[in-house]
Amino acid sequence: MASESFLNAHPDMKFRTEGFLAYQDGRFAEARKYFLQAAEFSDKPAQAMLAEMAWKGVGQPPDRPMGYVWADVAAERGYRQFVVLRERYWSELDAAERDRAIEEGSAYMQRYGDASAQYRLAKHLQRARRLMIGGRPRKDVDVWVPGPYGLRTQIRGHDFYATKFWEPKQYFAWVDAVWKDPPVERVEVGPLEGVEAGRERP
């Protein structure tokens, strides 16, 4: 199985990768389109990018409440870097912006939250797994996808057929292992900014 086929079977990683490539090239409207597609398949990094783009007005008019809405969806699983982003955005919203974020947030969580989006991805993985049976592994081809803190995550060709990439529960666990509190030795970052605790949440 070639790297393109592997990514086609994993639309969360595929569209996240396409989104980052477009973003790096300055094609922000195109990047946003790809991140939205990845977000449909429960991709939390893509949802965090949509939060940043809305908040800063990258490829769209600035929209701080929607920046928070996307950050809230991205932080759903408790990934530390996305929780920090959500907390920072909430602390900077004024009362009217918070009201709007609360008003619009439930619809986005319903569509892009794990209850819907992981189900969507699980169905896709199951279909793709049936199609890939009988294929020939390509051990010489690796896949690189955007990972935590701007680094890339490598998936080696000899792992393409590993169960963890095809069985939904195992795949979700693998994604969590990559993104939830990444080991210090895998990243080079500065200290995280502290966030004041005890703020009221919707």
Predicted segments with their positions:
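Extracytoplasmic and endomembrane cell-envelope/extracellular-matrix remodeling and assembly machinery
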Residues: 2-3, 93-202
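Short helix-capping/linker turns of helical repeat alpha-solenoids
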Residues: 8-12, 22-28, 40-47, 56-58, ...
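Short coil/turn linking the two alpha-helices of tandem helical-hairpin repeats
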Residues: 20, 51-61, 90-94
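Solenoid-like repeat scaffolds
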Residues: 37-40, 110
